[in-house]
Amino acid sequence: MNHSEARGSGGHKGYRGRSQASEQWVPVAADDKSLEDSSGNRVRGSQGKGRSRTSWSPRNSYGRGNDEHSPVQAYVNKSNVGFVEKGVQQDRKSLEDGIGSTKQPDDGAAAGDNKAVLQSKSTNVSGGSFVSSECEDKDGAKMYCDLVNRVNDVTLSCQESVSSTVVQKVELSSVEDQKSAPKADGAGNSSNESSTRHFDIFLEKKGIVLKPNLLVLSREKKKAAKGYSGTVIRPGMVLLKNYLSINDQVMIVNKCRRLGLGEGGFYQPGYRDEAKLHLKMMCLGKNWDPETSRYGETRPFDGSTAPRIPAEFNQFVEKAVKESQSLAASNSKQTKGGDEIPFMLPDICIVNFYSSTGRLGLHQDKDESENSIRKGLPVVSFSIGDSAEFLYGDQRDEDKAETLTLESGDVLLFGGRSRKVFHGVRSIRKDTAPKALLQETSLRPGRLNLTFRQY
């Protein structure tokens, strides 16, 4: 139970009346002003109307001698006491810190306040800053307690006991521990603790979110109005610049977020040697296991099933493949070379989220079926959010790799003769995501990348 103490100096000038009928002091208020208690109620000074009798004890005279016995003792209710300290002896550190511990008459009564009920006999409230109270519990044991009542500076309130507060803290701590405890998979495997917690690609909204600059929004709208442009990067590799509109990107982000928080959602992938990929991953259609480089229906470490690919995603892919085929055919006529891109129907989508420090080394997408690889069925990649420095080449050598900037809304396709191209992400360019996209979603800083392929 929290408690503060302040001592008065000398006798209070308001106590000047003395009763001749007994050895008890009757407090007389210095003026007619009412005293306002902590709850906003008005408490009248004792001008003969309340006639509350107040006892005093030499033990509480605090060494002032017999010159003036100020009536500084009062009986108070427990419910009216803001800060109570039982016992005359008190730890000096508790006094300095303003925290006192209430000792119960019985050790077994420490768990509850119902065994130590303070019974009020009389109460005296004066305009002074210090009141010393004498309390009596139900067992008849005397207790001396100090009550701080600074009306202008301190608001007195009923406080719960320290024991009940500690119990509440323990209960809350237990609930938080249960929430943060990692869930074991069906086989009892609790490894990859951080991996079992679904990653949220949205930031938690806090406070007021400022709207983006109108000039920036206007520039982005003009860019979107121009439509997309297609470029053949190399035989079998096509870049569709600004292919996905802001509305399309918002829809994709929202669906990925919803899927990512459910079964089979985003997690931290790793390898057998405990090395971790610098990204978060979620598989749709089929699960890809980085430890075995194989596809399956479920994830080995938690047994979750890969969610289905949304129909809207497949529609974007089919249109992008057809557009790429048209561009590749036109380029093939100009170069008089066989630059064909086969058509494909995606049944796998790997969704990766790169943070601002995310990256991915050069690699080949060659874990699909032999038939898919042999036919050169294309891989289609969507980029949303911050821009990425994309690497590609015929060798696993970053120094010899070509560089391409993939911005939000871009679609990259590589198939045919470029199906086995080495590719990766060197870095993410911070704060390059479209402001309009961030205004419509709470996408956290980074890049959301979806790669579609047919097994």
From Swiss-Prot:
It is found in: Nucleus; Cytoplasm. Residues 1-114, 173-194 are annotated as: Disordered. The keyword Oxidoreductase applies. It catalyses: an N(6)-methyl-2'-deoxyadenosine in DNA + 2-oxoglutarate + O2 = a 2'-deoxyadenosine in DNA + formaldehyde + succinate + CO2. One of its GO terms (cellular component) is nucleus. Keywords: Cytoplasm, Dioxygenase, DNA damage, DNA repair, Iron, Metal-binding, Nucleus, Oxidoreductase. One of its GO terms (biological process) is DNA repair. GO terms for molecular function: DNA N6-methyladenine demethylase activity; metal ion binding. Dioxygenase that catalyzes DNA N(6)-methyladenine (6 mA) demethylation with a low efficiency. This is DNA N(6)-methyladenine demethylase ALKBH1C. It comes from Arabidopsis thaliana (Mouse-ear cress). The gene is ALKBH1C.
